[in-house]
Amino acid sequence: MTQQTPSNGAMSREQLLEVLRENYVFPGNFPITVIARSDLAFFAKLHVALDELQGESTYTVEEKPSSKKNFMSFRIEIFVESAETALTRKEAIGKIDGVLVML
C-alpha cells in the first residue's frame, strides 16, 4: 500500500516517523535546531519547556548567536525512547512562543 502525501506537499505523520526511524537510532539522542530572537525570555521559555518535556531524561542546549547578535541558534539534543517521542517533543518545542525556524 502506498502512502499518499497531503496535497500541500507536506509529509504525513507516518511518513515523518518512517524517515526518523530510518535515520536515527532509538532509544538515543535526537537533535533539534531552533532559531529565535536573542532574548532572555525565549531562553527561559525554552529551558522550562525542555525541563517539562524531558523530565528525568537528559538534554543539552548549545547556543550560537548570529553575526549581528539579533538571532540565536539553539542546538538541542534530547534523549528519547522512540521516533514517536522524538516527533512529539519536536512538535511541542516548535509551539514555544518565539520560535522562528525549526530544523
Identify what each model region corresponds to.
Residues 1-73, 79-103:
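Long, contiguous binding/interaction regions
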